[in-house]
C-alpha cells in the first residue's frame, strides 16, 4: 500500500488530535495572516465572491470616519453593468463620478484626497452612462461594450 503520509509536508507539525483541539479563531487568524502575506493587506477586495450574504450598512454620512468604506454592489445583465453605492443625500453635492472603459471612480467618497476606484467586470461604453439616486442608493448604469477585436494566436512547437 502506498504511504501517502510521508509526502504530506506537515506530518511533524500537525496531527489529527491537534486539529480537533484547535480553536477556530486561532485558525482563522492564521489563515488571514497567510492570505495577507500572499495577496497584500486588502486581499478581500481582490476576490469577487466574498460573502454570499453581505451585511448591509447604513448609508455613509459626511461626518463619518474617513476609513469607512461603503458597501458597493456590482452586477451585470446581458447589456448593462450596474453599480449600487449606499450614500446619504448630503454627500450627493460632493461626490463626482468618472469612469474609464474598465473602472469607476467615485471622487470625494469617502475622502476628498482619495477617490474610490471600482473595477468593472467587463468593458463599458464611454457614452450612455446614467446615475440615479433613490432611497439612499446611488445607482450607476453602464452600457456594455462588445469587444469584437479577436486575434488568432499561433501555437509554436
Curated annotation (Swiss-Prot):
<protein>
    <recommendedName>
        <fullName>Spore germination protein GerT</fullName>
    </recommendedName>
</protein>
<keyword id="KW-0309">Germination</keyword>
<dbReference type="InterPro" id="IPR008978">
    <property type="entry name" value="HSP20-like_chaperone"/>
</dbReference>
<comment type="function">
    <text>Involved in spore germination; probably required at the earliest stage of germination.</text>
</comment>
Amino acid at each position: 500500500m502506498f504511504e501517502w503520509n510521508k509526502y504530506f509536508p506537515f506530518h511533524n507539525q500537525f496531527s489529527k488530535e491537534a486539529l480537533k483541539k484547535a480553536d477556530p479563531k486561532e485558525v482563522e487568524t492564521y489563515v488571514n495572516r497567510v492570505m495577507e502575506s500572499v495577496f497584500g493587506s486588502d486581499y478581500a477586495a481582490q476576490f469577487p465572491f466574498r460573502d454570499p450574504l453581505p451585511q448591509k450598512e447604513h448609508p455613509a454620512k459626511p461626518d463619518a470616519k474617513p476609513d469607512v468604506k461603503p458597501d458597493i454592489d456590482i452586477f451585470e445583465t446581458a447589456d448593462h453593468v450596474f453599480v449600487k453605492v449606499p450614500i446619504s443625500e448630503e454627500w450627493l453635492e460632493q461626490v463626482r463620478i468618472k469612469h474609464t472603459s474598465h473602472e469607476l471612480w467615485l471622487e470625494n467618497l469617502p475622502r476628498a484626497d482619495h477617490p474610490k476606484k471600482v473595477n468593472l467586470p467587463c468593458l463599458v461604453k464611454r457614452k450612455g452612462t446614467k446615475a440615479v439616486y433613490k432611497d439612499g442608493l446611488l445607482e450607476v448604469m453602464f452600457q456594455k461594450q462588445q469587444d469584437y477585436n479577436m486575434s488568432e494566436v499561433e501555437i509554436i512547437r
